[in-house]
Amino acid sequence: MERLIKLAEQIKDEELRKKVIEFLKNPKATHPGIVDTGISVEEAPASINWHHRYEGGLIEHTISVTKIALKMADVLEEVYGVEVNRDYIIAGALLHDIMKPYNYIRKEDGTFDHYDMFNLDHLTLAVAELYKRDFPIEVIKIVASHHGDHSPTRPNSIEAYIVHYADEADSKINDVAVRVCQARSRDLGISEQEIYKAVNPLKVYEVRSREGKLKTIEFLKDILKSIGIISEDEKKDENNESLENKESN
């Protein structure tokens, strides 16, 4: 959470900065009908079946989206000479998924799932809470439209498009990475979540894209062995089996 607050402190407008920091520190739904599932922003994944689907994924995704969006703002100003409101970008990016924890529960095995009693979706909850907390309409529109054409309202400002495409870029690249981790977890006969405890999925994808499948398996075995997730005997058995596999994924 401190990393999110540090980004929020870059907001120049004092009133907006205070509102964003307060929301980050107290991301609770005001309406009494919204069920608190007990999942914090710090522990929540960013999704269940897609990108950042591991503990801490939501914060990781939020930081990345905010930083990507600010870099995009730099490029658009430098190349096209437009003025971009960075305060709105930071606020919208930091808060775009802030209510996702209300859609998740933690299962007995420690993994996450959707809350089956169904709170409102995270976008609806966020927009409602932003209205309740009297945020600027420009920030509300950024959050409301961050899914682009799949949002209830489409982006209608440079800032809204920046946040939307920053969100999409980070989501897409992480989704590719977690699918590689999913495949390698099957190769290793372990839970996909065990990989995420040991190494960031983008690092796994980096190894996969540069060195191939077999090197990725070896990379993961070494890391997993070092933290006790697999034993030396398991590593030897898997080494022998891997040598028989063809480079196919």
From Swiss-Prot:
Enzyme Commission numbers on file: 3.1.4.56
Molecular-function GO terms, alphabetical: GTP cyclohydrolase IV activity; metal ion binding
Covalent S-S links between cysteines: none
Catalytic activity: 7,8-dihydroneopterin 2',3'-cyclic phosphate + H2O = 7,8-dihydroneopterin 3'-phosphate + H(+); 7,8-dihydroneopterin 2',3'-cyclic phosphate + H2O = 7,8-dihydroneopterin 2'-phosphate + H(+)
Swiss-Prot/TrEMBL keywords: Hydrolase, Iron, Metal-binding, Zinc
UniProt pathway annotation: Cofactor biosynthesis; 5,6,7,8-tetrahydromethanopterin biosynthesis
UniProt cofactor(s): Fe(2+); Zn(2+)
Function: Cyclic phosphodiesterase that hydrolyzes the cyclic phosphate of 7,8-dihydroneopterin 2',3'-cyclic phosphate (H2N-cP) and converts it to a mixture of 7,8-dihydroneopterin 2'-phosphate (H2N-2'P) and 7,8-dihydroneopterin 3'-phosphate (H2N-3'P). Is also able to utilize other phosphodiesters as substrates in vitro: hydrolysis of bis-pNPP and pNPPC produces nitrophenyl phosphate, and that of 2',3'-cAMP produces 3'-AMP. ATP, 3',5'-cAMP, GTP, 3',5'-cGMP, and 4',5'-cFMN cannot serve as substrates.
Protein name: Dihydroneopterin 2',3'-cyclic phosphate phosphodiesterase
Organism field: Methanocaldococcus jannaschii (strain ATCC 43067 / DSM 2661 / JAL-1 / JCM 10045 / NBRC 100440) (Methanococcus jannaschii)
Lineage of the organism: Archaea, Methanobacteriati, Methanobacteriota, Methanomada group, Methanococci
The gene coding this protein: mptB
